[in-house]
Amino acid sequence: MAKEPTQNVQDVFLNHVRRSKTPVTVFLVNGVKLQGIITWFDNFSVLLRRDGHTQLVYKHAISTVMPATPVVLFDPSRTEGATVDLTEKDLAGDADLL
């Protein structure tokens, strides 16, 4: 039996808003508010693009990431609760998530 890749909600959420180019508001722990589109992320940082400029934001400085539109990461018809519903499309081409 093939073992499915382990996913965490942070990576699934960030990958979803990155792929859909959903505008986000990022609140930092010091209260600063940043807005833009997440273009890339890894275990330690996020690239945020706005008005043609890119900012490198370290994850330890982030308090909250709030998308401009609602994000659905799981199938609400499931009774399992907080199970993340991943498709092959969600994982395709994202070596950092496998």
Curated annotation (Swiss-Prot):
Native source species: Gluconacetobacter diazotrophicus (strain ATCC 49037 / DSM 5601 / CCUG 37298 / CIP 103539 / LMG 7603 / PAl5)
Annotated ranges, domain Sm: 11-71
Keyword RNA-binding recorded: yes
Signal peptide: none
PROSITE patterns listed in its UniProt record: SM (PS52002)
One of the record's GO molecular function terms: RNA binding
Gene Ontology biological-process entries: regulation of DNA-templated transcription; regulation of RNA stability; regulation of translation, ncRNA-mediated
SUPFAM superfamilies from the UniProt entry: Sm-like ribonucleoproteins (SSF50182)
Phylogenetic placement of the source organism: Bacteria, Pseudomonadati, Pseudomonadota, Alphaproteobacteria, Acetobacterales
Annotated function: RNA chaperone that binds small regulatory RNA (sRNAs) and mRNAs to facilitate mRNA translational regulation in response to envelope stress, environmental stress and changes in metabolite concentrations. Also binds with high specificity to tRNAs.
Keyword Repeat: no
Protein name: RNA-binding protein Hfq
Pfam families (alphabetical): Hfq
